[in-house]
Curated annotation (Swiss-Prot):
Key words of the record: ATP-binding, Carbohydrate metabolism, Kinase, Nucleotide-binding, Plasmid, Transferase
EC numbers, comma separated: 2.7.1.58
Swiss-Prot/TrEMBL catalytic activity: 2-dehydro-3-deoxy-D-galactonate + ATP = 2-dehydro-3-deoxy-6-phospho-D-galactonate + ADP + H(+)
Protein name: 2-dehydro-3-deoxygalactonokinase
Active site residues according to the UniProt entry: D260 (proton acceptor)
Residues annotated for ATP binding in this entry: N167, Y168, R169, T228, R229, G230, E231, D232, G233, G257, T258, G259, D260
Effects seen without this gene: Deletion of the gene does not affect growth on glucose or galactose. Double deletion mutant kdgK1/kdgK2 loses the ability to grow on galactose.
Superkingdom as given in the UniProt entry: Archaea
Residues that, per the record, bind substrate: G35, A36, E37, S38, N39, Y90, Y105, D106, R107, R169, D260, D296
Record text on subunit structure and interactions: Homohexamer.
A GO term for molecular function: ATP binding
Length: 318
């Protein structure tokens, strides 16, 4: 299979207590899979873009659960199996004001942290239309910093469009470490996606969102810069023009994975040859739909996205 979009990164087991319960007292935990790069692949796949996910997993029921879940959504896993490695996980306790949502990682020494290019199916990157990874991946280990750079270089040399989400996680590394690592990768990146707050915190840039996008495009020669702005929507700078997209109103059930849904939809439209402004709209609509379902994955359909874009309501569909 030649995938149009290939993503690379870690997928974890997500464990969460029932809504309104605390981890320290819950008698049961909901079991799902989650990872920025696989979330992106799922969103793209469900919108008609052939997608593959590249990684390393333990050869265990937990590792196989990950690949089974991805195949359910049409994503083809290309995995290096490791008999002795462990599966990363995270626990999430959903907050309600004034109590914030709390995330606890248990991902140290996960299989993916030792992944090297010579262990991976690099040829699928060379054959893809686009390759995507995020700042989470190089944060996990020094080995992954090197592997991420080598895969981006492989994609660049093959003429594959490269996309990178800054995706800063303060529980994984400091802003200065993130800046040093990510800026070393930027020369190999065509499409940069970043939350406005991450640009300010990690890259230490100032100004409004259009100014940030223009500065990044100028400083690092990105073909496209996408800035996500939470409730203020998103914008993209491409070809010297800035396009803005407001959010779609949504009744939020679970916000985790919203940004990944946006990116997956955005890339799926770029790969399909759609203009940047159309890709932005698809990203925003898919992100809104993702917020209405539990879990990290955007379990959506193209018809649902089109309905949001047309301004359809949320009544009963009979």
């Amino acid at each position: 299979m030649t995938a149009e979009l290939v993503t690379f990164g870690e997928t974890m087991i997500r464990l969460s207590p029932p809504e309104g319960e605390r981890i320290e007292t819950a008698r049961s935990l909901e079991f799902r899979t989650a990872g920025a790069e696989s979330n992106v692949a799922v969103a793209a796949s469900r919108l008609g873009c052939s997608a593959a996910w590249l990684s390393k997993l333990p050869d265990s029921p937990l590792g196989r659960r990950v690949t089974t879940e991805l195949r359910t959504h049409g994503v083809e896993p290309y995995v290096r199996w490791d008999d002795d490695a462990r599966q990363g996980a995270y626990y999430i306790e959903q907050g309600r004001a004034p109590r914030p949502t709390n995330v606890i990682y248990d991902r140290a020494d996960a299989a993916v942290t030792t992944a090297r290019p010579d262990e991976l199916a690099v040829d699928i990157v060379e054959d893809a239309a686009a390759f995507y990874t995020s700042g989470i991946t190089p944060a996990l280990s020094e080995t992954l910093r090197e592997t991420t750079g080598e895969l981006l270089q492989t994609a660049t040399e093959a003429g594959t469009t490269t996309a990178f989400d800054l995706n800063y996680r303060s529980k994984l590394w400091s802003p200065s470490d993130a800046r040093d690592a990510c800026e070393s990768l930027f020369p190999k990146v065509d499409v940069l996606v970043a939350a406005e707050r991450d640009i300010r915190a990690v890259l230490e840039l100032d100004g409004d969102a259009p100014t940030l996008a223009s500065e990044l495009a100028g400083d690092f020669d990105f073909e496209t810069v996408v800035v996500t702005r939470g409730e203020d929507g998103a914008l993209a700078r491409h070809g010297g023009t800035v396009y803005e997209q407001p959010v779609f109103e949504t009744d939020t059930v679970d916000a985790i994975g919203t940004g990944d849904a946006f990116v997956g939809a955005f890339l799926s439209r770029l790969i399909a040859g759609e203009p940047v402004e159309t890709a932005l709209a698809y990203g925003a609509a898919t992100a809104a739909l993702k917020r209405t379902v539990h879990g990290d994955l955007a379990v959506v359909t193209p018809d649902e996205v089109e309905r949001v874009l047309r301004g359809g309501d949320a009544g009963i569909d009979r």
